[in-house]
Amino acid sequence: MASFLLSTLVFFLAALILVPQGLAQYHLNPVYEAPVNGPPVNKPPQKETPVQKPPQKEPPVHKSPRNEPPRHKPPHKKSHLHVTKRSYGKHATEEHSIHF
């Protein structure tokens, strides 16, 4: 009998601890509660302090030597196929005509 009363008492205390407001507001309609927090405050963004990191040395990269382009344009050489402009005007004379 004592164990039954003790277990009932423990069960009742556990119910009160685990569900403190469930039994009290079971039949009540939900009531709107205003938020506890105030309106948001505009704060300037916090600047993070820079973290000093040791410099990392990268291994040297092997680059093949390159020939630099000439700085000055070389003089133009006339090829043996170069054809000079004719000395006559728009129309060729009979001497320069190749038609037979």
UniProtKB/Swiss-Prot annotation:
InterPro entries: Proline-rich_CW_protein (IPR051308). Residues 39-78 are annotated as: 8 X 5 AA approximate tandem repeats of P-P-[VQHR]-[NKH]-[EK]. GO terms for biological process: nodulation. Residues 55-71, 91-100 have a biased composition (Basic and acidic residues). The keyword Signal applies. It is found in: Secreted, Cell wall. Keywords: Cell wall, Nodulation, Repeat, Secreted, Signal. Residues 1-24 form the signal peptide. Involved in the infection process during the plant-rhizobium interaction. May also have an additional function in the proliferation of the bacteria. This is Early nodulin-12. The gene is ENOD12.
